[in-house]
């Protein structure tokens, strides 16, 4: 039962995403554009369907919200293929920005500091944003200036590679700064 409903639902969704073609067009009159992109003007739907049939092509509703709707004579299979291909290319070009996090402590050693900086540089080269957080434990929170100094060291070490989205600020027991890769680099 579930499989049957799933198949029907998938077909319903896929058909609604496509423009109407041929006999699915319900308008009485349409603004017709032929296969050579020449405007014919407002034509009766029967006449438009006959012209498409004579050309061996389909009548496809391009702009359904216009009054009267705009229809074009073209190969519907080729149209579906090209629109699917354009959608695939657009998805390929999209870049998903990921927020990575690097945690520091106020009394970090030099070696650990440099290792974490190298990792931050890798994240930035991949085009990801980086959330740099500094965790205070116990009485360390009384010395916030240590945190500000650490963030200054990070800024100086990454100068030219980063653009600061959010400057260092306190959130509870942690200090946070968000950086992203500098577009110029």
Curated annotation (Swiss-Prot):
Which UniProt keywords are present, listed alphabetically? Cytoplasm, Initiation factor, Protein biosynthesis
Coarse class of the protein's main subcellular location: cytoplasm
One Pfam family in the UniProt entry: IF3_C
GO annotation (BP), single? ribosome disassembly
Question: Which Gene Ontology cellular component terms are annotated?
Answer: cytosol; membrane
Subcellular location(s): the record lists: Cytoplasm
Q: GO terms for molecular function, please?
A: ribosome binding; translation initiation factor activity
Report the family membership. Answer: Belongs to the IF-3 family.
Self-association and partners: Monomer.
The job of this chain, per UniProt, is described as: IF-3 binds to the 30S ribosomal subunit and shifts the equilibrium between 70S ribosomes and their 50S and 30S subunits in favor of the free subunits, thus enhancing the availability of 30S subunits on which protein synthesis initiation begins.
**Protein name per the record:** Translation initiation factor IF-3
